[in-house]
């Protein structure tokens, strides 16, 4: 039975028993930055189990894609070398939220395994928690399992908990017996770590809530969470012992062999590559891009490990990206999002391959040299150098060292890392301002509804210290009980404006959160005096706020437009929105084409002209996501979120300030598109009057160019192209004339060659020639003089260019590189090259005649 058939059969089995099929959630957990990746089927139901979310169903079934690489689940070094370690796997699971409990969970599992899949009863074992008599009774008296194949286990292996506190409960695990040909004892025995008895399904019965004291309290509605690895059950159904022998992996291993040129399908490197393409492709599909921290670094580690194993198989060219199509063939039908993202995924992988290829070979040479010393430990300094200079993740170096029976000095590596961090801190140009201590009430924000509000001063800070009052010209931070000022957040700059009281005027230059919920108004007291307890009128700069709103609303339209034009892989990676401009960073692995930029710009302007009402609404995070709201990648949101929608074109979670109608933005212009990091692009744009002024300035510059060309603006590009063609033609003619002139000069100059110990030596200048002509003349002299040493010089714009040549018969004693350095030093320069030809430059043209005159004596001394 194929893996795809098992997956489908599982979903249909539970759907027929009242379960709702829930699609796999992304590998990046929504609204939970504390969890690196989705690593189990229950992750997307976590809030349901905790009672913080309700679903319109009480039974669910899913096939969840999971990644375990990084943190406590980091088994990367084992992947490819054992039968069941993977970075990516699929978890089949059925769930009950306060509906059925132990009895049906066990009976469903037994029916599916023995009925739907036809696994012989005698091949299955079960374990229960030692104190779980209820589960044991169901197995023995309702399922009818042989008592010799039911094991009570008292360890934590059979008691599951989400954390130190919260929902928890006993487990019942189902094992498959691969037979006596495989070593290992039954679960709970001394030899249980062997591979004969393999866990295939874990049934978790959440029936308690553990409090802070550790005491267990029965849950009013017990729930069920189960998980069965698709790869493991496929191995059982296909009667193979290793997951890498199932149909899904066989096709990927064959593809890996094809693109690497490997003939041995049992090679562990092919298993590594086959495993890693699944993890990498799905991580990229779900918005992760290779980087140097967090999820991006885990992806980079997996990618580079796969690349290194290809290198180990002799493949020095990019190959890993070629496997994306093979993966789509195998898994695309079950996960259409992979099919949609195939081009983007392949592009990101290829870019990372090319990036790593620049340093891989040199890094391997350094590592091979270090490993060849015969030491049992690889020094931390070498590990750090490979990491810092050549981009080798530490576990990649450890992987290679382990193949030689060598361990790495992690303590030494950590010492080097700490020293680097200390150096970085010492050389930093800026230091973070010390946080202001504040223990009062939070600031109440009114800025969505008004730009002016009465408030009371709660705290004043001057030079980082709390004070009771401030006077004229004092720079300070003011904390108010209420404010219309927006504090910098989500990429939007803080508001500016003024605070007015009967005794003074405070100019607010910026607004920042000094801690959660507390707004600091930064600026200077322009006149008078202010003290804690004073009443003030807080007034936001209306023009700046309005222009900022134009730009912020435009970023939402831009984000949606980019996803339409470039694809759904585009996600926001950063933004800056202030009164003058907007800057938007997004995931995309190549520079945008000019037509794509225009498409995006036109799409945004079309939405502006539609004059959508900009609607804001407060709702739960889950409701917002269900309505299609875009959330920032990796951001943590509260229980209630603010949703900003512009028609059906853009819906995002956002706490910023916006226009009332999209038409208020007026006009949108993209002024720049660039790369800021691998896989991250940046767009800079203008809106409203600023966009209009930019456009008018461009038109004015075009008119000036057209006037200079004596052409109409619409004909300027064609006229300029003609002029450039003429210039290129004239440059060719000049080069031809220079070459002819050099030929004439060379005929007369060749007679100046001196003979030293049977060798012809010529050192002279050429006038009005470029470097290309200089080289051609050098070759001409060498061909005509046969056994010779030639040095030629020319002067252009007060700079000296030198070239030296030595015929092959003389390079054992006379090196062109040594000669050119000798001459170049005399004219204030330096150079280098091969033994037969070298080039240099200089800054002292007046010294050139004397330098060339010294060549014969140098030749004589070095013969």
Swiss-Prot record:
It catalyses: tRNA(Ala) + L-alanine + ATP = L-alanyl-tRNA(Ala) + AMP + diphosphate. PROSITE patterns: AA_TRNA_LIGASE_II_ALA. It holds the Pfam family DHHA1. Its EC number is 6.1.1.7. It is an enzyme of class 6 (ligase). Its cofactor is Zn(2+). Signal peptide: none annotated. GO terms for biological process: alanyl-tRNA aminoacylation; negative regulation of DNA-templated transcription. It is found in: Cytoplasm. Consists of three domains; the N-terminal catalytic domain, the editing domain and the C-terminal C-Ala domain. The editing domain removes incorrectly charged amino acids, while the C-Ala domain, along with tRNA(Ala), serves as a bridge to cooperatively bring together the editing and aminoacylation centers thus stimulating deacylation of misacylated tRNAs. This is Alanine--tRNA ligase. The gene is alaS.
